[in-house]
Amino acid sequence: MELHLALRASPLPAADPGRRPPPPRGNFATNCTAAINSTHISQEKFRSLDSWVEHNMLTFLKPVEKCWQPQDFLPDPSHLSAEELGDAVREIHERAAEIPDEVWVCMVGNMVTEEALPTYQSLISSVLGGTVAGSTPWDRWIRGWSAEENRHGDLLNKYLYLTGRLDMRQVEKTIQYLIGSGMDVGVGNSILCGFIYTCFQEKATFISHGNTARLAKHHGDTTLAKICGLVAADEKRHAVAYTNLMKKLFEVAPNESMLAFAHIMRAHVTMPASRMFDGRDPRLFTHFSAVTQKIGVYTVRDYGEMLDFFLKEWEISAVVDDLSPEGRQAQEYVCGLPEVMGKMAERADDRRKKLVNVGEPRYIPFSWIFNKQVCV
């Protein structure tokens, strides 16, 4: 599902991923609570979208019988002899042997994030105020979306286990720690902030899984490449659904949506997997993020391009009606962000080059790969 949305310009941020970020700064969002309160949409406006969700969002969910399932890509012990099963696993081992350690770190980090789905479902349900068995279009979307997402962690977990390249007990501990730690992403109970946040999550996850698919293919594991590609395709479909929803919300509640967009961009919102922990490394998420930046799985430049995409898709600069003075200030702020992100990406590239050219490279051990060290 979601990933680290924005990476800092430095390849190894100094901030402890377990700490809450500083409060947002600026004239119109100095108080986080006040900023979130300004983004609330009325129940009347929100419920007016029930029919729209029914006909324009639920259609992005696939019938279960037409969905791929994890078992489609795994050896099936019920249909293989012991010898055939052993051969199938050996083939997976042989393909996996060619994949570098840093790619496995990214694969595991992505999979662990997917496995924390219960937290994400709880977050969206709490923001929407839905019920477990509710029949509204919103309730059905949440359950259907979660059901599709659930296959991602299942498949990645099982396949990575079969590669023999990972310390699965450490991976499993990381998953349990992450789900148990909960998540406060800084959106309060704002529906609009929650949906904008999720738009970025789904888009970032699509990018990340797509890039791991490319790397797996490059190193010769076409099956793993296909698996990551299928997950990326699901994430892209979900991202389109959430992006279309926010475009509609900008039409229905332009001022509240603009303030929500600015809040998400300014508040240094905690990333979904920022509490990632394996029982050993308190800066695990920071180190994982540094690896994704280094090998191009997810970078500052990706984040900047993603931001630019949403600005254009939601036609932010063209919103003129029903904006308060604060809304116009928020609009000006978010429209100026691509230039800022471009400079951040350039600084990140420059710092990376300096680290390569000056001094010894830095290596970090990851328990997921039996404490082998990876250059960050």
UniProtKB/Swiss-Prot annotation:
Parts of the chain that traverse the membrane: none
Any one GO molecular-function label of the UniProt entry: metal ion binding
Subcellular location: Plastid, Chloroplast stroma
Main localisation: plastid
Reactions catalysed according to its record: hexadecanoyl-[ACP] + 2 reduced [2Fe-2S]-[ferredoxin] + O2 + 2 H(+) = (4Z)-hexadecenoyl-[ACP] + 2 oxidized [2Fe-2S]-[ferredoxin] + 2 H2O; octadecanoyl-[ACP] + 2 reduced [2Fe-2S]-[ferredoxin] + O2 + 2 H(+) = (9Z)-octadecenoyl-[ACP] + 2 oxidized [2Fe-2S]-[ferredoxin] + 2 H2O
CDD domains: Acyl_ACP_Desat (cd01050)
Transit peptide: 1-33
Quaternary structure, from the entry: Homodimer.
General function of this protein: Converts stearoyl-ACP to oleoyl-ACP by introduction of a cis double bond between carbons 9 and 10 of the acyl chain. Converts palmitoyl-ACP to (4Z)-hexadec-4-enoyl-ACP by introduction of a cis double bond between carbons 4 and 5 of the acyl chain. Catalyzes the desaturation of saturated fatty acid 18:0 and 16:0 to generate 18:1 (delta-9) and 16:1 (delta-4) intermediates, expected to give rise to 9-alkenes and 12-alkenes, respectively.
Protein name: Palmitoyl-[acyl-carrier-protein] 4-desaturase 2, chloroplastic
